[in-house]
Amino acid sequence: MPFNGYQTYYRIVGDRQSNKTPLVLLHGGPGSTHNYFEGFDDLAAQTGRPIVMYDQLGCGRSSIPDDDQLWQAAMWVAELRALRTYLDLPEIHLLGQSWGGMLAIIYGCDYRPQGIKSLILASTLSSARLWAQEQHRMIRLMSPVDQSAIATAERLQDFTGAAYLTANQHFMTQHASGPITADDPEFLRRSKRVGTTAYNVAWGPNEYNPTGTLADYEYTDRLQYLQMPTLVTSGTDDLCTPLVAKTMVDQLPHATWTLFPRSRHMAFIDENTAYMTRLRHWLAAHD
C-alpha cells in the first residue's frame, strides 16, 4: 500500500467475501512486525473471517525511512486510517497488542472512528507512567545481580553493557517472550527486520524507560470515549500486569477482561488454543 511516499506491507487471510466482519491486527513495538500474528491464520481458516495484518512503517516488509521525525503516534494513526480506506474496511474488529493497543486507544479516543464493532486490547496499557512503575516493581523481584545491572545502566544511561543486556534478557524472557527454539512455529523462527530505530525513538531503550515520543502517553482518563464493546486480555506473568490491565478495565465503559494463567506478554502464543477459543467466541458475539 502506498503511504506518504513509502510502502506499507499488508497481508490478508480468510475470505474477503465472507459476511463476517474483518479483524484488523495492530502489532507491538513499535517495530515488532506482523510475524507473530500469523498464529491467527488458523482462526481465519476455521471461521472464514478475513483477518488483516500489516507491518507498520519502520519495520518488516514495509519501508524503513531514515527519518527520526516520522516516529510519532500521529503518523502510525494516519497509516491505519489509510489502510482502512485503501482496503475498503468500513466495519472492523480491531485488535492491538502492546504498542498496537496504545495505537488503537489513541485512534479510538482522539479520532472517534466509525465502524469499530469491537476492540480487543491485548497486553497493552493506558499510562506510560504506570507501565514504567510496574516494570520497576517486577525488576525488584529479580536477582540482586540483575537488579544491580539494570540500576547501574539506568544511572549511567548506558544500555550497552554485557551485565545489563543479560539482565534485560532475563526480564524479557520472564515477562515477554522467548527464547525461540527449533520447536517454535516457522513464523516465530523466521528472520525479520525489526524496527529498532522506531522503537528507540518512539518508546525508549527498554520496556521500563519510556523516554521517546510516547513518554507522555496518558490515556486512562480518556478511555471513557471508547464506547464500543472491549475485550482486555493479558497474562499472569505479563509486562501488562494485572494492575495495568485492571486500570483500563475500570475506566472502559463496556469492558470484559480475560486473564490467561500461563501467559506472558503474548497470550496468543503462550496459550494459543485458549486464546483463539476466547477470541472466536468474542468476535461471533459482536459481529
From Swiss-Prot:
One of its GO terms (molecular function) is aminopeptidase activity. It comes from the Bacteria. Keywords: Aminopeptidase, Hydrolase, Protease. GO terms for biological process: proteolysis. PANTHER family: HYDROLASE, PUTATIVE (AFU_ORTHOLOGUE AFUA_2G14860)-RELATED, MONOACYLGLYCEROL LIPASE. Releases the N-terminal proline from various substrates. This is Proline iminopeptidase. It comes from Lactiplantibacillus plantarum (strain ATCC BAA-793 / NCIMB 8826 / WCFS1). The lineage of its organism: Bacteria, Bacillati, Bacillota, Bacilli, Lactobacillales. The gene is pip.
